[in-house]
From Swiss-Prot:
Gene from which the chain derives: tmk
Enzyme Commission number: 2.7.4.9
Catalytic activity: dTMP + ATP = dTDP + ADP
Protein name (Swiss-Prot/TrEMBL): Probable thymidylate kinase
Similarity remark: Belongs to the thymidylate kinase family.
One Gene Ontology term from the biological process aspect of the record: dTTP biosynthetic process
Pfam families per record: Thymidylate_kin
Coiled-coil residue windows: none
Amino acid sequence: MGIFVVIEGIDGAGKSTQAKLLAKWFEKKGYEVILTKEPTDTAFGKLIRKLVLTGGREGIIDGARISHEAEALLFAADRAEHVHKLIKPALESGKVVISDRYFYSSLAYQWARGLDLQWLIDLNRFAVRPDLVVLLDLPVKESMRRINGRSIKTEFDKIVELQKRVRENYLKLAEMFPEIRIVNAQNSIEDIHRDIVGLVEQEILSGI
């Protein structure tokens, strides 16, 4: 089997940057790496990206609203394709898979939108559990500063409140799932990368 690492965190935490740096680190060590993300680039993923842009309200597609439950099911459908067509085959062939977000994002965000946590967990039971989940923890105030230049289509105060709930949920999930390790995302990019590499060496490579 291969190695499966997930990078999680609220918006602006630096997930994509750290996922790319970790992929390069593994490649330098001679591993074959698959760098992926959720939502994916499949039809499901593209549909979800349209939903995500609407923020904390119910998703809107072509003017029609869908419920948070329907949104959660779309995320799960996209994830099922992701797991069965990319993640499982890559791991079975001995590759390293690094994912920018995974089902923990669904738990944190959709729980913050009022859905039942246990229902969300049950909905994602098919998902392969990673060897390590790096939670890049960042205060919401800093998150908002970092993403201020991005295109935001919802009211600022609603985004702040949602991100606060999501951050709280991530920290609660870290107490529930032993594979989650917290890294301070306020540090420099280099220091964060060093912390992540340390976790990979300690939690995964030391046992190989």
